[in-house]
Amino acid sequence: MINNSLKITDLPNNERPRERLLRYGSEVLSNSELLAIILRTGTLHENIINLSSRILKESGGLNGVLNLSFEELKKVKGIGNAKAVQILALGELFKRFKAYKSFESVKITSPKEAANLVMEQLRSFNKEHLYVIMLNTKNIVIKISDVSVGSLNSSIVHPREVYVEPILKHAASIILCHNHPSGDPKPSNEDLNITKRLYECSKFIGIELLDHIIIGDGIYISLKEEGLL
């Protein structure tokens, strides 16, 4: 079956978004042109530039279209399953990038907020990673560091590796976060032993250990909330 959808390559060279991006840089392209590069093809009666422009207009702009559900996207004329999935993937990447880039100046007031801050990164790893969230006196995030990779045990996780950067950053407190690749956040005996050891060290160092959060597959356990810290 012949694909009659109008493609970017069907447009004149000076109107093709990809060529314009390569020649002038991505910053000069409009939102509709950038979306056209992602979606690639138009419909039988509408080229991709016009389609992208209409999608943005009918959805209330870039923020609007990136927050639509699959069902809502499918209601927009010209969007089928493939284009809806492409837009959903683009929106999710944008959300993850925004969360990753904007963690600084975030104030942590609950274990849930701390877990949400690192959930997407930690749940994607197939090995255990130990993150240290460093906070100032107002519980605002200074930095997040990945200090250990591999199964958590006392021979690998040394207090020196955990506390050296918080000391250099003048952190007032820290929150430990690590993942269980199995998806089950239930703490192991080793998790509890390491937490106890690091908590005792925090008393001498003067940097308070507020919590140890274990990340599973979209779920978490706070040792503080469980009364284990």
UniProtKB/Swiss-Prot annotation:
A motif (JAMM motif) lies at residues 178-191. Transmembrane segments: none annotated. Pfam families: RadC (PF04002), UPF0758_N (PF20582). Belongs to the UPF0758 family. Keywords: Hydrolase, Metal-binding, Metalloprotease, Protease, Zinc. It comes from Clostridium acetobutylicum (strain ATCC 824 / DSM 792 / JCM 1419 / IAM 19013 / LMG 5710 / NBRC 13948 / NRRL B-527 / VKM B-1787 / 2291 / W). This is UPF0758 protein CA_C1241. It comes from the Bacteria. Residues 107-229 form the MPN domain. NCBIfam families: PRK00024.1, radc. PANTHER family: DNA REPAIR PROTEIN RADC, UPF0758 PROTEIN YEES-RELATED. Zn(2+) binds at H178, H180, D191. GO terms for biological process: proteolysis. GO terms for molecular function: metal ion binding; metallopeptidase activity.
